[in-house]
Amino acid sequence: MNRYRYCPCCGSPLEEFPIAGALRLTCADMRCGWVFWDNPVPIVAAIIQCEDRDGAVLLARNAAWEEGKFALVTGFLERHEDPAEAVVREVREETALEALEVALVGLYPFERKNELILAYHVRARGEIVLNEELAEFRLIPPDQLKAWDFGTGLAVRDWLAGRRG
Ligand SMILES: [Zn+2]
């Protein structure tokens, strides 16, 4: 994990100081008072179901990931963006698919990456064209889809349970 060593506001060294129940990196200059809160970053994730591929679910491999690793399409929110709009935009940017319907699946803390995943089910249509962030994709029929037990896989698990329930 990258750690700040100097205050990004004033350049003073940082020291660990107990604030609000945890040790936090805090600016040594009391007049500055900058604190590294290390709060989780929200990201949107899409369980994309392709209308014109018999409802197959799209999993993608990020260009930075090793071979064989696939997960949901994810992305950051822009300032002032509604999460449901952000997921539609990310699906369009990363896969060129057009979202027809968006439904919240759930919220999933992902501690290892210090993220909060906002997971949506997205019914989509169109021709799949990946952008440079993604290396390859797989289309998996929902009845063959297997959830993984971390990160966006927990949203897949819940979505599958809802379909079968
Ligand atoms: Zn400072």
Protein language model regions, located:
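Acidic, metal-coordinating catalytic segment for phosphate/diphosphate chemistry
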Residues: 2-45
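A short coil-to-beta-strand element that immediately follows conserved catalytic motifs
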Residues: 16-18, 97-106
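Conserved beta-strand segments that form the floor/walls of ligand-binding pockets within enzyme
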Residues: 9, 26, 71, 103, ...
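Conserved Nudix-box catalytic region and its N-terminal flanking loop in Nudix hydrolases
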Residues: 50-93
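Conserved hydrophobic "DFG−1" position in protein kinase catalytic cores
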Residues: 48-49, 59, 122, 139
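Short acidic/glycine-enriched loop/turn segments that link adjacent beta-strands
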Residues: 21-23, 67, 111-115
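Active-site-adjacent beta-strand/loop module that shapes the phosphate/pyrophosphate-binding cleft
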Residues: 106-129, 133, 138, 142
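NUDIX/MutT-family hydrolases
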Residues: 130-161
